Curated annotation (Swiss-Prot):
Domain of life: Bacteria
The species this protein was found in: Geobacter metallireducens (strain ATCC 53774 / DSM 7210 / GS-15)
EC number from the UniProt entry: 2.4.99.28
Chain ranges on the Cytoplasmic side, renumbered to this chain: 1-16, 71-81, 167-169, 215-233, 301-312, 365-375
Protein known as: Probable peptidoglycan glycosyltransferase FtsW
Transmembrane segment boundaries: 17-37, 50-70, 82-102, 146-166, 170-190, 194-214, 234-254, 280-300, 313-333, 344-364
Taxonomic lineage: Bacteria, Pseudomonadati, Thermodesulfobacteriota, Desulfuromonadia, Geobacterales
Keyword Metal-binding: no
């Protein structure tokens, strides 16, 4: 794999600067909001109000470095590494279950423990799946329209990945990867009746997955009527609503939120947008949503104008992943969707998510340098 890190102003202009600006701005904003949302809790738990800020700052620097590396690698080179990368990620997903290697938290086994850092392989697996599908869809071309060659093999792969993720109690990542895969197949020309049939067949299984597992069933019931159990299953979403209500139109002011003071669970991770809503108001939330929308729209433009099918599928998969995660997170914190445990890209606290997200943006930026009409 050829790497070239020499950058000049003329070369930078070849990248989609809107995508680059949105990614960097959201990341910087995320570092600020992680500190605001976590400082009180960090002071009590670690006797250091800057604990999460320092870690998120390091993750942001590493993520930006990963993005720069990905920007400088010709995206077409990922084609030959797609299969080994996917196999490597499958191995990492399985290592999570080995005692002494894997780590668990709140009943979920999703991490591989390293000194000072926990790696979440599911974040890597999302990009690995996109790379592999882009490579495979490019290779199959018209064969993707047939069930035996263009649909069934991907469903087998998806079933294996989702089974591992469900064993890790990571339904959010499983649904996200499933959604990305289905949309990539649809964009590639898979017959809609195959997709519709698969969705219909999956619904009973999904119902069983949710209603047969106590904590998932309670989440659905809390989603339908959080006030029925406001001190337990409905507590988190009610506190989130209170945060948005306190913020109003213009917010209480940066750092002035009250719900993060041990009222709102996961204030610096999954529910960080609630803190944004309380401190920066509806205006702040709209600005964040608009930035995500702009990033997604520019990403779709890159996909549509890519010079080759591999670049088109790769860009489409990445922008779909970012869009789904942002939409689901916003839906959860506002009560439009049941609680899923998905981070808000760029903004929520978390090393694996931030670094992998910025790396994916770097790939997208490289595709943007080789669109139709560019040399």
């Amino acid at each position: 794999m050829n790497l070239n890190f020499k950058l000049n102003l003329k070369e930078i202009e070849r990248y989609d600067l809107v995508i680059l600006l949105m990614a960097v701005a959201l990341t910087c904003f995320g570092v600020v909001m992680v500190y605001s949302a976590s400082s009180v809790m960090a002071t009590k738990k670690f006797h250091d109000g800057f604990y999460f800020l320092k870690r998120q700052g390091i993750y942001a620097i590493l993520g930006c470095a990963a993005m720069i590396v990905a920007m400088r690698i010709d995206y077409r080179q990922w084609r030959e590494y797609a299969v080994p990368i996917l196999l490597g990620c499958l191995l990492l997903l399985l290592l999570v279950f080995i005692p002494g290697i894997g780590g668990a938290a709140k009943g979920a086994s999703r991490w591989i423990r390293f000194p000072g850092f926990n790696l979440q392989p599911s974040e890597l697996a999302k990009i690995a799946l996109i790379m592999y599908m882009a490579y495979s869809l490019d290779k199959k071309q018209e064969k993707v329209k047939f069930f035996s060659t263009g649909f069934a093999p991907y469903m087998v792969l998806l079933a294996i990945l989702l089974a591992i993720l469900l064993k890790q109690h990571d339904l959010g990542s499983a649904l996200t990867m499933g959604g990305v895969a289905i949309l990539m197949l649809f964009a590639a020309g898979t017959r809609p009746r195959y997709i519709l049939g698969m969705v219909v067949l999956t619904l009973p299984f999904l119902y069983f997955l949710v209603m047969n597992v106590d904590y998932r069933r309670r989440r659905i019931l809390a989603y339908l009527n959080p006030w029925e159990d406001p001190t337990n299953t409905g507590f988190q979403i009610i506190q989130s609503w209170l945060a948005f209500g306190n913020g109003g139109i213009i917010g209480q002011g940066l750092g002035e939120g009250k719900q993060k003071m041990f009222f709102l669970p996961e204030a610096h991770t999954d529910f960080i947008l609630s803190v944004v809503g309380e401190e920066l108001g509806l205006i702040g939330v709209i600005v964040i949503a608009a930035m995500f929308l702009m990033l997604v729209l520019r990403g779709v433009r890159v996909a549509l104008m890519a010079q080759d099918p591999f670049g088109r599928f790769l860009a489409f998969g990445i922008v779909t992943l970012l869009g789904i995660q942002a939409f689901v997170n916003m839906g959860v914190v506002t009560g439009l969707l049941p609680t899923k445990g998905l981070a808000l890209p760029f903004i929520s606290y978390g090393g694996s998510s931030l670094i992998v997200t910025l790396f994916a943006v770097g790939i997208l930026l490289n595709v943007s340098t080789r669109m139709k009409g560019t040399p």
